[in-house]
Amino acid sequence: MKVLSSLASAKTRYPDCQVVRRRGRVYVICKSNPRFKAVQGRKKRR
């Protein structure tokens, strides 16, 4: 899964990709081609 600062290009990479919001983060998931998975933002430090 790629960590990107912006998902603008990741949304249109593949026709089956969909944008999902989970736990305050934005994910791009693609069940037919999982290599296009991406998440926006980075891990928070404690």
From Swiss-Prot:
Pfam families in the cross-refs: Ribosomal_L36
Family label: Belongs to the bacterial ribosomal protein bL36 family.
SUPFAM superfamilies reported for this sequence: Ribosomal protein L36 (SSF57840)
InterPro entries: Ribosomal_bL36, Ribosomal_bL36_sp, Ribosomal_L36_bact
Record's protein name: Large ribosomal subunit protein bL36A
Residue stretches in coiled coil: none
Species assigned in the record: Sodalis glossinidius (strain morsitans)
Keywords: Ribonucleoprotein, Ribosomal protein
A single Gene Ontology CC term: ribonucleoprotein complex
GO molecular function, one term: structural constituent of ribosome
Biological processes, Gene Ontology terms: translation
HAMAP family according to UniProt: Ribosomal_bL36
